[in-house]
C-alpha cells in the first residue's frame, strides 16, 4: 500500500479546503491499514502455522504396505514444505507502505505482525515451466462429407481471424472499393417490386398489353422506373404464373394418390436411399418408367430366390425332358394353373408398384413387395398372363439360348465357352477407364447421372466428362460406357487384376457378382464378415482407430492406435463440400494463419474440414510421409481415402504429402506467410497407381 501524494492537487484550493482534504486522506489511509492488519495478517499467520504442523506430522517414510507414500508432497522431488517470509513486519517500507513520520499511528497490541521465530527461512521454490497446449478450433464430427449450407458461405461477408491473440479482419482497401462498386451496380440494376406493384403490372399487361408504347411509358412514369425493368418484370411474372397454372392443371388431372407418388418419386434419392436428399438434389435425374427398367434384369447367372422360384422349376423340368435321341431341350415349363390363383385388388396394386420399382423381375417383386402373399412362380405366371400379347419377357432370350445347347457338350468346350464369355464382358473397358488402366494420372470430373434413353452417344454428360455410366444413369444396361463390376473370387479384390481396383473404384454389391454385403457370421447362409470383399472399406466404414495428440511438427497431430501394413486403409477424409470460389475465399484466412484443411475433390467441389470433419483433418504435411491420399469412386461419388505408404508402427504420427507447389501458400514450403494476396492452397489426391 502506498500513501497517495496529492500535494500538486491542492495548489488551486484555498488553504482551509486543502487542510480538510488532507485530513480526510490521512483518516482513510489509517482505516485501510487497520482493516488489513485485523483481517489478513492473522489469517496468514494461522495458515502458515497450520502447514508447518501438518508438514512436521507427515511421515516421509513408507506406508503400511512398505511402498512409497502416495501423498502429493512426498512424491515431489523438492516439496514445498515451508513458506518463505520475512520476520520483519515492522518495515512497512519493504511492504510498500509510506507513512507520515509526524503522524502517530496506534496499532493493536494483540495483533501479531510477524510469524513465529522458529520458522526457518528457506529459498523460494520455482515451479517448472509447462508448455501450453496448441491452439485448437471447435469443429463438428461427421462420418461422411456434406454439402455446405448456403448460410455458411463466406463470399461477400466479413471474415474475422485471430493471429497471436489479436482479432483481425480479413479485408483490404481494394476489396472494400470493389464491394462498394458492386453494391452500387446492384442498386442500379436490380429493382424490387412489391406484391401490389406486381399485381398492378400483371393486370395492366393482361388487360391492355405491353406492346403499346403509350402504356409502357405511362407505367414507367407512374412507377418511376425504366421501361426495360417493367418489361423484364412482366416476363418474370408471366413465366411464374404460367408455371403455377401448369402445375395446378397437372394436379387436377391426377388423383391425390398418383400426385403423391409422383412427388415422392421426385424427392427420393436413389443413391442415398432417403427422401429429400441435400447431397444429390440438383444432380439427380428423373426416374425412368417401368418399360425402361425391364432391360436391367437378365436371367444370366441368376440363382433361384426360393423353393417356389420359377428358375428352379424350369431347371428341374428341363432336366426331366432331355431326350437321348433328340438334340433339343423341351421348351415346356411346368407351372401351376393361373386360374387356381386368385389375386385381390390390393395384391394387383402391389404387383404394379413392384413392376414399376424392380422391373419385370418376379424374384425381386416376390422378395420385396409380395413377400408372404404370393410366390415367385405365381408372380411369374401372372406376369405372363398379363403381358402375353403386349410384352415379351427377357426370359425368352435365355430360353432360346438353352434350346441350342445339346446333351453331348464336352467338358473342355463348356469351360472354353465360359472363359470366352467372361473375357468378352471385361476385355472392353469404357472410354473413361483408358487413362487409369494405362497408368496415367487422371483428374476426375463431377459425376452427374445421364438421362439417355438407350445407349449413350456424344451428347451424354458421362462421356463428355470422361466418367463411366453408373447404375443410376438412365441408359440401358448394355451401354458401352457402363461399368459392369468385377467377377473376382471372394476376398481377392486386392490387386490390379480386379477391374474395380484397377479403376480406383470400390466394389459394388449390386454390380460385382462375388462381392456380397453382409453383417452376419455365416450361420444363416450369408457370407461371413471375415471373408467379405476387401475393396469395400468406404461402404463398410472400416476406419482405423486414430488418436489425437500434440504433434512434434505443428499443433495437433494424428497418431495410429495399432500397427498398420503397407497400403492398408486408414479412413476417409471428410468435411464440407464447397465450390472452388468458396474455397478460394476461405483459403485467404488459411494463408494468414498458416494452416489448411482444404482438399481438392474434382473439377467442381473441394472438401473443407475446418468446421466439419473427422480425426484425419489433423494429419500434417511431410516431404517423407508414411501415408498417401487416394481418390476413389464409391457408387458414383468421388471420395478421398487415406492409406499407409509403408508399414507403420503403433503410436506413430501420421503424415502425408499435401502436394503443394510454387503456386501454393508460402507457409506450406517453410517460408513466412505473405501479408497480402491469396493463393491456391488446396491439397490434391495422389494420381492413380
Curated annotation (Swiss-Prot):
Cellular component terms per the entry's GO annotation: nucleus; PcG protein complex
Cellular compartment(s): Nucleus
Keyword Hydrolase applies: no
InterPro entries given in the database record: CXC_dom, EZH1/2-like, Hist-Lys_N-MeTrfase_plant, Pre-SET_CXC, SET_dom, SET_dom_sf, Tesmin/TSO1-like_CXC
Region (Disordered): 1-20, 51-73, 169-188, 666-689
EC number assigned by the record: 2.1.1.356
Main location: nucleus
This protein's record includes keyword Nucleus: yes
Residue stretches making up the SANT domain: 339-389
Induction: Maternal MEA allele is activated by DME but repressed by MET1 in the central cell of the female gametophyte, the progenitor of the endosperm.
Positions of the SET domain: 544-659
Top-rank lineage group of the source organism: Eukaryota
Reaction equations catalysed: L-lysyl(27)-[histone H3] + 3 S-adenosyl-L-methionine = N(6),N(6),N(6)-trimethyl-L-lysyl(27)-[histone H3] + 3 S-adenosyl-L-homocysteine + 3 H(+)
Region (Interaction with FIE): 1-109
Additional remark text: The MEA locus is imprinted. Maternal inherited gene is expressed in the ovule (the egg and the central cell), while the paternal inherited gene is silenced in the pollen. After fertilization, only the maternal inherited allele is expressed. The paternal repression is dependent on DDM1 protein, which may methylate the paternal locus, while the maternal inherited allele is allowed by the DME protein, which may antagonize or suppress DDM1 dependent methylation, and activates its transcription.
UniProt-recorded name of the protein: Histone-lysine N-methyltransferase MEDEA
Organism: Arabidopsis thaliana
Lineage, highest ranks first: Eukaryota, Viridiplantae, Streptophyta, Embryophyta, Tracheophyta
